[in-house]
Curated annotation (Swiss-Prot):
GO terms for molecular function: ATPase-coupled phosphate ion transmembrane transporter activity; symporter activity. It is found in: Membrane. The keyword Transmembrane applies. Residues 44-62, 113-124, 176-207, 314-343, 393-406, 463-478 are extracellular. Although related to the sugar transporter family, it does not transport sugars. This is Probable inorganic phosphate transporter 1-9. Residues 509-532 are annotated as: Disordered. It is a multi-pass membrane protein. GO terms for biological process: arsenate ion transmembrane transport; phosphate ion transport. The chain crosses the membrane at residues 23-43, 63-83, 92-112, 125-145, 155-175, 208-228, 293-313, 344-364, 372-392, 407-427, 442-462, 479-499. The gene is PHT1-9.
Length: 532
């Protein structure tokens, strides 16, 4: 059967240049995603000194500034995940990138510079739109990479795409440091009051340009990748199994990859009468879908929700616990807080985050997804408990260079990325049928981003009370750490009870579909029935 031959050829294909090209093209979207999502912490430090120098930013406004992009990301995952299955992965892949490019520039050119409230509303709007594009990139990149990859190294390829986030975090920190240093050195260091956005402030006027420049630079990687995305063909699995056009699928793969048997598949398929696309034997969220895939969807969504509660809260700790704003404000040290937060983020990314990603790339197809995910949740729980119980001892003097705490903080990110933060991105791209794959990945990812909102907003409100020296209340931070440890334990339990291993199996094997001969089967379902 031509479909079976095509999928078998893809699963057995040797590693070749196009696989690495696909990793770069798909990964640059996630690179941009990470840049845009994680540059906001140091930027909010700058905005607080430029527009709110007499008062600190309220918890409600700070929570909204973090949550608005995450909300857009969740909606983008749902919308583009659905569109990826409805009209094709390739057709909407470039659209998500364009949204990121234009909204990044929109953030920089926030349309009102006369009042700080207007600036924040404009920035919030464009951050929300930016989130839509970022969210769209998650299910499309994961699905495309999973459908291009061979069976033996599929996990490593998807993990490599996701690992570009680490480089995006590192780049956002580097850009922030360079911009802050350049603007600081260009300033005169005076303490004279100036006018920024209609407000009297010690911050120099050019500081209002600095944070906008950081945001706009995030558009460049996405813009440079757009052309190459448009050259990518539709995935063979979507064309063959959803559109029922195995001839076109074989031709597309022959154009970009050297796969044995592709030429023969094209010849054999051309001699057969093409069947028109038929409706799926069951619909999304139907009783049959839930009986076959409900457990997998629950496990993928719950685990992503839990890990994002922890991961995004951990990132927020960077700008809240490590307080660098105790110097008197003048026209140059308006950049100091942002620089210090970005520098620490760069150190954590280089020493913990990026190595964690690449440990997963190396071990994912050797150890398996479930074992890595359980190990990551367990060790993160241990680190949170070790850091949380004696928290007041670590920070009794609030030493920003406390080496013991910094090591523990870095281990959180290492075991997050050599663990559930990466595997929750991989598993939903491998479990579901081709016609539901992008949608289910989007649902799982959206659950994760709602977890990120819960963690981010919850932590900000839980630690809103500060001590006399301006640091968050020690008791509240300790409780937050212990709660995060409990969340990790819950993730380990959910993984153990509900998550299925996908290593070493084809995507069609992982679908685990049971097709009845009495039901009206599509060619894709008939393929699965004959194969198994």
């Amino acid at each position: 059967m031509p479909e079976l031959s095509l999928l078998s050829a893809l699963d057995a294909a040797r590693i070749q240049w196009y696989h690495f090209k696909a990793i770069i093209v798909a990964g640059m979207g996630l690179f941009t995603d990470a840049y845009d999502l994680f540059c906001i912490a140091p930027i909010m430090k700058m905005i607080s000194q430029i527009y709110y120098h007499k008062d600190s930013i309220g918890t409600a406004l700070l929570s909204t500034s973090y949550a608005i992009a995450l909300l857009g990301t969740a909606l983008g995952q749902l919308i583009f995940g659905y569109l990826g299955d409805r009209v094709g992965r390739r057709k909407v892949y470039g659209l998500s990138l364009l949204i990121m490019v234009f909204s990044s520039f929109g953030c920089g050119f926030s349309v009102c510079t006369t009042r700080r409230s207007c600036v924040m509303v404009s920035l919030g709007f464009f951050r929300f739109v930016l989130g839509l594009g970022i969210g769209g990139d998650y299910p499309l990149s994961a699905t495309i990479m999973s459908e291009f990859a061979n069976k033996r190294t599929r996990g490593a390829f998807i993990a490599a795409v996701f690992s570009m986030q680490g480089l995006g975090i590192l780049m956002s920190s580097a850009v922030t440091m360079v911009v802050c240093l350049a603007f600081k050195n260009a300033g005169e260091g005076s303490s004279e009051k100036t006018n920024v956005a209609g407000l009297e402030t010690l911050a120099p006027p050019e500081s209002d340009i600095a944070w906008r420049l950081i945001l706009m630079i995030g558009a460049l990687p996405a813009a440079l990748t757009f052309y190459w995305r448009m050259l990518m063909p539709e995935t063979a699995r979507y064309t063959a199994l959803v559109e029922n056009n195995v001839v076109q699928a074989a031709k597309d793969m022959q154009r970009v990859m050297s796969v044995s048997m592709i030429s023969q598949i094209t010849e054999d398929s051309s001699s057969e009468l093409e069947q028109p696309p038929s409706s799926s034997s069951y619909k999304l969220f139907s009783r049959r879908f839930l009986s076959l895939h409900g457990r997998d969807l629950f496990a993928a969504s719950a685990n992503w929700f839990l890990v994002d509660v922890v991961f995004y809260t951990s990132n927020l700790l960077l700008s809240q616990i490590f307080n660098f704003s105790n110097k008197p404000l003048n026209s140059t040290n308006v950049y100091d807080s942002a620089f210090e937060v970005a520098k620490l983020a760069a150190i954590v990314a280089a020493c913990s985050t990026i190595p964690g990603y690449w440990f997963t790339v190396y071990f994912i197809d050797k150890i398996g997804r479930v074992k890595i995910q359980m190990m990551g949740f367990f060790l993160m729980a241990v680190v949170y408990l070790v850091a949380g119980i004696p928290y007041s001892w670590y920070w009794s003097k609030h030493e920003k260079t406390n080496k013991g705490f910094m090591v523990l903080y870095g281990l959180i990110f290492f075991f997050s990325n050599f663990g559930p933060n990466t595997t929750t991105f991989i598993i939903p791209a491998e479990l579901f049928p081709a016609r539901f794959r992008s949608t289910c990945h989007g649902i799982s990812g959206a659950a994760g981003k709602f977890g990120a909102i819960v963690g981010t907003v919850g932590f900000l409100w839980a630690t809103r009370h500060h001590e006399e020296d301006g640091f968050p209340d020690v008791k509240r931070v300790r409780i937050a750490f212990l709660i995060l440890g409990g969340v990790c334990i819950a993730g380990m339990i959910v993984t153990y009870l509900f998550t299925r291993e996908t290593m070493g199996r084809s995507l069609e094997e992982n679908e685990d579909e049971i097709v009845s001969t009495s039901a009206g089967s599509s060619p894709a379902n008939e393929l699965l029935r004959r194969q198994y």
